[in-house]
Amino acid sequence: MFHGSMVALVTPMQVDGAIDDVALRELVEWHIAEGTHALVAVGTTGESATLEMREHVAVIQTVVEQARGRVPVIAGTGANATHEAIELTRAAMEVKADAALLVSPYYNKPTQEGLFQHYSAIAEHCHFPIILYNVPGRTAGDILPETVARLAPRADIIGIKEASGKVERVAEILALCGDQVQVYSGDDGAALAAMALGARGVISVTANAAPRLMARMCDLALAGDFVGARAVNAQLTGLHRDLFLESNPIPVKWALHEMGRMESVLRLPLTTLSSVHHERLRESLRRAQCI
């Protein structure tokens, strides 16, 4: 259903911390013009943890309205509590998003059975395309391939964003699930390797700054041209690394400010990128022809 370079959109903010609707709409237009294959609104990179519920839904709605069906919009609707995830997913449905991306519950650390029941309940209550999101480095929990396989027969669970840092997980999940789910890389630096193993694309931080190159790399890889894809990816390796010099989305918001696209404002407890990293990230932006 979804493939290629799916940008994990930042949420632009004004200097007073309010959401910058104009900059957000401009980002959507830019991504569509640059060839981004899908837009992921209000995930981790979109600062979902510090948005109020009304803001969260408003950002999804703005992205959907501006996209106007030209590319799919995937809404981040994960939450610690299952009932809250259901509420957010239903809200995304109401504003006409195309699918939901649900990070696994964090901090409360559910068991594998708890994860199974959590996602099953969301699927049963929402009947909407769901992409699981596994990122143990943030959630302190790991959605194991065997749990994905238990969920895979549910028609509404269509894929997983795999950000465990273990590229072999792509092959493990596909071996257990076949074509019942699609796997998407959640790690820009490993995206090319993941696609070689059968992933259908990447939910990307790097695409925020270099959308055309990320889309080109994915197009080549999914067409089987890994020589060409490696050549493109070589221009992006600095960004893959340096956009994580500090916690995401701190570096990528600074990068977009450096590119003249938006303010580098974040909400506390996130703070702007330390000046000691500026020149290194600036050089990676130059290498990727972003500035």
Swiss-Prot record:
Compartments, record wording: Cytoplasm
PROSITE patterns found in the cross-reference section: DHDPS_1 (PS00665), DHDPS_2 (PS00666)
Chain sites annotated for binding pyruvate: 45, 203
GO cellular component: cytosol
UniProt keyword annotation of Cytoplasm present: yes
Keywords: Amino-acid biosynthesis, Cytoplasm, Diaminopimelate biosynthesis, Lyase, Lysine biosynthesis, Schiff base
Pathway terms, separated by semicolons: Amino-acid biosynthesis; L-lysine biosynthesis via DAP pathway; (S)-tetrahydrodipicolinate from L-aspartate: step 3/4
Site keyed Part of a proton relay during catalysis: positions: 44, 107
Molecular function as annotated in GO: 4-hydroxy-tetrahydrodipicolinate synthase activity
Protein's UniProt keywords contain Amino-acid biosynthesis: yes
InterPro entries noted in UniProt: Aldolase_TIM (IPR013785), DapA (IPR005263), DapA-like (IPR002220), Schiff_base-form_aldolases_AS (IPR020625), Schiff_base-form_aldolases_CS (IPR020624)
Assembly mode: Homotetramer; dimer of dimers.
Function comment: Catalyzes the condensation of (S)-aspartate-beta-semialdehyde [(S)-ASA] and pyruvate to 4-hydroxy-tetrahydrodipicolinate (HTPA).
Family note: Belongs to the DapA family.
Protein name per UniProt: 4-hydroxy-tetrahydrodipicolinate synthase
Protein source organism: Acidithiobacillus ferrooxidans (strain ATCC 23270 / DSM 14882 / CIP 104768 / NCIMB 8455) (Ferrobacillus ferrooxidans (strain ATCC 23270))
